[in-house]
Amino acid sequence: MSDPQAALRASWKAVVSDLLAQSEQPNSDVPNFSHSQRLNLQLVEPIMIGDGYALIAAPHENAKTVIETELGEYITRALSQHMGRPCSLAVTIAAPPQPAPQEEPPAPAPQRPIQTEAPEHGMGHQTQAFQQPTQSTQPAPASQPETPNHHQPRSWEAAHSPASLDELAQHYSEQQSTAPSGYPEATGARIPREEPAHNPNREKSLNPKHTFENFVIGSSNRFANGAAVAVAENPARAYNPLFIWGGSGLGKTHLLHAAGNYAQVLHPGLRVKYVSSEEFTNDYINSLRDDRQESFKRRYRNLDILMVDDIQFLEGKESTQEEFFHTFNALHQANKQIILSSDRPPKQLTTLEDRLRTRFEGGLITDIQPPDLETRIAILMKKASADGTDVDRSVLELIASRFESSIRELEGALIRVSAYSSLVNEPISLEMAEIALHDLAPDSADRQITAAAIIEVTADYFNIDVDTLRGSGKKRAVAHARQLAMYLCRELTELSLPKIGDQFGGKDHTTVIYADRKIRKEMTENRNTYDEIQALTQRVKNHNQR
């Protein structure tokens, strides 16, 4: 009788081998994987392959992110080819070796975040707003899933599909984390369709890099920052809901992640979920398609803190608004915290249902404005320090004086200067910054740059049809041009990630993130990519002045 685990590993090895081979072929639909991508792919372990789904385990969180955002599409396609039917993919994190249990010292009281502020009127660091009482007001965490039975035999192909891939990954994660000592590998059980909702606290929806400690405070965002801290310290007791609005690229998303991360430090076990409105909408649509409405409700209503980014994108989606209305009510009535962000205040979300807008207005509404000069310089100093880049203050002042409306635009300018410095292998100077920013410097006389203009210019530059550039073709030349256009949309427009994805045939926001990161990296390593960005930027600006 054959070993099912050996057969599983052999099948997975064949999938990986095929993928790596395809990535090396010149005319393949699979891109040429980088060294780190190949390494992460080879470190993945198969956990379960079922009827149209697969669960794999990455060795750590960074590898999981790479697999999901950069390689997931190609892995899914290869698995589907090997299985002879469409396949969905779920990724979890392999459990580390369990140390022997030992008595833990009592945890110290959590400290308030130490935050960076822009100097104001020569007074240096300011006292943070919203000082809250120190007594514990932790809300009762929502009910946890039942402990799995680790003594049942592992089933490598379940009798039926799990209620959702998220629940499949979560079920495995809980098996690993709760396995008793003496069991080096948790044995699995088949997953019943009506399993309790998975633990959002473990789904890693929060970006650990976004914290209050690295959020630069100035007069334009101090109140919003203080409100977010207060909500993290006292969920559902300070301000509920908290509604943060402001233009794209000003730090709203950073504050939402920071609040979630800080709340989990203060209140271990708190169930926190961050989603964009696009993700909420897609989850809801998929639950209708797959007849998983109850699973969807458990996932979003069995929480202590729900954060929804860019809530304005619910406009025009009547059925999704209806579901979010009921989700909002369920959480609010259960005394659970809700944090929302938008590019406009509630009153200006005119196509949202009145009952939603009135609920948004029932808590605290605070805005974030474009940062002042000193705050912009402080942001650039923080960014340069985080990237390990040595930049003279005069260069930072030059950049800060030219880019006023968006933090994303500000940091993009610094990235372009740093990339040019790496390419020419010279230290950053004022003269170099002037050269690097020549085509990027904003012109107040320019009309607003649109994604359509960027796509049209990029298609013409590479002699590609516009529909092809917007489409899903995987040829390297087309994929590279599309990634350049996505990067420029991110840098030159105020569009959010979901809106940029919409301009490219409805691509997911993670595809835009991948393109942005890939081109940023290539700009520091490949002169051709840097020159392409410079040339395209100039053409877009010329096109915009017609």
From Swiss-Prot:
Bias (Basic and acidic residues): 191-209
Show the segment(s) annotated as Disordered: 96-209
Where composition is biased (Pro residues), the residues are: 96-111
Keyword annotations from UniProtKB, A to Z: ATP-binding, Cytoplasm, DNA replication, DNA-binding, Lipid-binding, Nucleotide-binding
Q: Which GO terms describe its biological process?
A: DNA replication initiation; regulation of DNA replication
Q: What is its main location?
A: cytoplasm
- Pfam families the record matches: Bac_DnaA, Bac_DnaA_C
Q: Which GO terms describe its molecular function?
A: ATP binding; ATP hydrolysis activity; DNA replication origin binding; lipid binding
Q: Where is this region: Domain I, interacts with DnaA modulators?
A: 1-85
* Binding annotation for ATP: 249, 251-253
Renumbered to this chain, region (Domain IV, binds dsDNA) spans 422-546
Cellular localization per UniProt: Cytoplasm
* Low complexity compositional bias, start-end: 126-145
Give me the ranges of the annotated region Domain III, AAA+ region.
Answer: 205-421
Subunit and interaction comment: Oligomerizes as a right-handed, spiral filament on DNA at oriC.
Looking up HAMAP family in the UniProt record yields:
DnaA_bact
Q: What does this protein do?
A: Plays an essential role in the initiation and regulation of chromosomal replication. ATP-DnaA binds to the origin of replication (oriC) to initiate formation of the DNA replication initiation complex once per cell cycle. Binds the DnaA box (a 9 base pair repeat at the origin) and separates the double-stranded (ds)DNA. Forms a right-handed helical filament on oriC DNA; dsDNA binds to the exterior of the filament while single-stranded (ss)DNA is stabiized in the filament's interior.
Please state which protein family the record places this protein in: Belongs to the DnaA family.
According to UniProt, the name of this protein is Chromosomal replication initiator protein DnaA
Give the organism the record lists: Corynebacterium aurimucosum (strain ATCC 700975 / DSM 44827 / CIP 107346 / CN-1) (Corynebacterium nigricans)
